[in-house]
Amino acid sequence: MPGDRLIAIGGHRVGRNVSPHELLINQAGSDVLLTFMKMDGTLRSVTIKALYDESRARYREWVERNRQIVHEATQGRVRYLHIPDMQAHGYAEFHRGFLAGVVYEGLIVDLRYNTGGFVSPLIVEKLARKRLGYGVSRWGEPEPYPPESVMGPMVAITNEAAGSDGDIISHVFKMMKLGPLIGKRTWGGVIGIYPRDTLIDGGVTTQPEFSFWSAESGWQLENRGVEPDIEVEMRPQDYVGGVDPQLERAIAEVLRLMQDHAPKLPDFSERPRLPLPEEG
């Protein structure tokens, strides 16, 4: 609970010279007894199964916190989604946020820390869909045409830790003018490798075999990266203070775009009543 203090792990006290990490060595997958002191001084013990890796849990917490920040700052009008890579995990995360996001008035696409892969064409195809109309049935809700098309404006956030296919999708988002690109210049590493050769000791060699060319940048994405439309720095004190000026600027930009180009669902209360065709 908030305010509880961890004082012991497995019966051993946590202190200035004994960290929780030290007491959790070799405990992954095992049941571990944790003892907490509550704010009123009483003790509470729980048994948990220690994880091998907490990065997925920390990632989910970060994404959900960002989503909550966006939801509260926009009164529920804007959807936030993060794409961690351009492989299976990133493709799943994209659809987790995007399919629920097409009904919102605005969309923030977070490409920061994207480690690359190969599925950016599939994601760009979805982001580039323009809502042209609606399919309206007699009883059901109106469905956007084309399906899974974004209702309102989009903005994207990127940074210096987005690379490879993360570079490429940042570049294409900007090149196709899907919305403003906010943050810092990307990593600039679009030459791909292929781990095809295994060594006798179990190691693997890789060699550069792929690159990227576009009509706008030519070959210059490598070693240069993608310049954002709006540069916003993340300072060390921002990390320490839990402040995200890049996300704050993205929220401000998408709200501005929504004000200038307000998305609006047409009024379908009056359905067409066409007469029967005349004979002859």
Name every feature range the model reports, one short phrase each:
Residues 68-69, 162-164, 199-231:
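Metal-dependent DNA phosphodiester-chemistry modules and their immediately adjacent helices/loops
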Residues 103-105, 134, 214-280:
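In a subset of proteins, long, contiguous C-terminal domains/tails are tracked
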Residues 2, 7-203, 238-243, 252-260, ...:
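Cleft-lining beta-strand/loop regions that shape enzyme active-site pockets
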